[in-house]
């Protein structure tokens, strides 16, 4: 009966409706610093087609940044919103105040910054911050207030949009300060600054420092750890898809018990990005390794668990292919997923790689359960023409080295599936149980 049912309204959605329905911007914004939100709004503005929508985003930019010290840019936004060539006096006055405060910070921090630029002084510094501060006080007249000025100056530069200067000042502060709360705050500030200057190696160093700080400083505060890990997960999305070496590190981090628990508890929408990371990892060096297979199995398990908490075409692709074994639904969801990927700030650059890898996964799964495969049928499931599908299958057989023969006359592929021993089947089934036991043991140990 279900086979003869009319198409659902869901199947008739336009690309625009799909993009609007699965827009994650409202969920992401609460966990990002306002300066980190700005690139997302810029991207969203470029995606809009109507002037009305663009104007709304311009107003959002203004509301986002008006409390910062980016006075010139905020004034330009005001002019754009109000269609005015003049700048109100309040912006002129604030700009003067910002310049004066910058000059004051330069004066107040001049002595300590000069000391930190002196190779002879730096050469005498050790890993002991207390000893360093004592050395600077006794030998060079530096004070704790001077060190704290670096922190305030760094935050001020950040508010002005001078992220490179902010990163350097916060780093200098962190070298000397023994104030753990301010050091933690400075580390978050330096992470944001490295992201905004697209210094991905520096950003990844700060991700590790923030992670360590959460683990140690908030050890006796589970709720605080949960909140801070939620923030770190969201901030980590920037290097995740922009810095190749970060992919493995952050994917492993997200799959670790503490962070996968955070995702499932606080932000299940992050499954979109974890799914995209795992799927696109297929094209990378370790695509045939046990690590990739383990990540894929873990992902399938988590998508199944969170099905009632979060769904989008990207996670639904996994569900259709590996949970429901519905190849037609998988192809449909892949088409929708491509629309979502191209409209997502973090995933737009990974869209082609995702689609390519997803087609491979469909092909591999389809070939595993069929002895004789109709090339035309498989091509349709992959969204390819018959000629494209034929080339695709030839490449798939070559790349994966499966035992298969193509009958060009009949337009079919004959798969030679070796029988799997009962012993091997038992091993495969017990692997999953062993993993679950490990996770439960880790949870009980806490």
Swiss-Prot record:
- Could you tell me where this protein is found in the cell? Cytoplasm
Report the principal subcellular site.
Answer: cytoplasm
- Name of the molecule in the record: Eukaryotic translation initiation factor 3 subunit E
List each copy of the PCI domain by range.
251-420
What gene name does this entry carry? INT6
Q: Which UniProt keywords apply?
A: Cytoplasm, Initiation factor, Protein biosynthesis
Query: What does the protein in this record do?
Result: Component of the eukaryotic translation initiation factor 3 (eIF-3) complex, which is involved in protein synthesis of a specialized repertoire of mRNAs and, together with other initiation factors, stimulates binding of mRNA and methionyl-tRNAi to the 40S ribosome. The eIF-3 complex specifically targets and initiates translation of a subset of mRNAs involved in cell proliferation.
Q: Which GO terms describe its molecular function?
A: translation initiation factor activity
Q: Which Gene3D superfamilies match?
A: 1.25.40.570
Q: Which PROSITE patterns does the UniProt record give?
A: PCI
- According to its UniProt entry, this protein's organism is Coccidioides immitis (strain RS)
């Amino acid at each position: 009966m279900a086979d003869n049912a009319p198409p659902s309204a869901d199947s008739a959605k336009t690309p625009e409706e799909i993009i609007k329905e699965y827009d994650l911007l409202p969920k992401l914004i609460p966990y990002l610093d306002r300066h980190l939100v700005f690139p997302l709004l810029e991207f969203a503005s470029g995606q809009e087609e109507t002037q009305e929508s663009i104007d709304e985003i311009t107003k959002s930019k203004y509301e986002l940044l008006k409390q910062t010290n980016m006075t010139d840019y905020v004034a330009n936004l005001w002019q754009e919103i109000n269609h005015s060539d003049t700048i109100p006096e309040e912006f002129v006055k604030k700009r003067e105040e910002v310049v004066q405060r910058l000059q004051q910070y330069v004066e107040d921090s001049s002595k300590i910054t000069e000391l930190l630029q002196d190779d002879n002084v730096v050469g005498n510094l050790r890993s002991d911050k207390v000893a360093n501060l004592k050395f600077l006080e006794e030998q060079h007249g530096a004070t704790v207030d001077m060190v704290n000025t670096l922190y305030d100056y760094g935050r001020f530069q950040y508010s002005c949009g001078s992220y490179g200067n902010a990163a350097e000042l916060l780093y200098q502060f962190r070298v000397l300060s023994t104030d753990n709360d301010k050091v933690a705050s400075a580390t978050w500030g330096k992470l944001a600054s490295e992201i905004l200057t697209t210094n991905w190696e520096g950003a990844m160093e700060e991700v590790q420092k923030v992670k360590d700080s959460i683990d140690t400083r908030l050890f006796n505060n589970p709720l605080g750890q949960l909140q801070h890990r939620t923030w770190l997960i969201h901030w980590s999305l920037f290097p995740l898809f922009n810095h190749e070496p970060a992919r493995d590190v952050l994917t492993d981090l997200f799959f670790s018990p503490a962070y996968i628990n955070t995702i499932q508890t606080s932000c299940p929408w992050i499954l979109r990005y974890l799914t995209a990371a795992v799927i696109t990892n297929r094209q990378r060096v370790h695509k045939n390794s046990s690590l990739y297979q383990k990540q894929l199995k873990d992902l399938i398990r988590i998508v199944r668990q969170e099905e009632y908490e979060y769904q989008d075409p990207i996670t639904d692709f996994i569900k259709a292919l590996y949970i429901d074994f519905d190849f037609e639904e998988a192809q449909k969801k892949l088409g929708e997923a491509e629309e979502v990927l191209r409209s997502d700030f973090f995933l737009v650059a990974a869209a082609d790689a995702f689609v390519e890898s997803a087609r491979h996964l469909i092909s591999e799964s389809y070939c595993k359960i069929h002895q004789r495969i109709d090339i035309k049928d498989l091509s349709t499931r992959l969204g390819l023409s018959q000629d494209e599908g034929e080339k695709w299958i030839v490449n798939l057989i070559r790349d994966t080295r499966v035992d298969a023969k193509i009958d060009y006359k009949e337009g079919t592929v004959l798969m030679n599936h070796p029988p799997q021993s009962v012993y091997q089947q038992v091993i495969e089934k017990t692997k999953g149980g062993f993993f679950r036991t490990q996770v439960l043991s880790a949870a009980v140990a806490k």
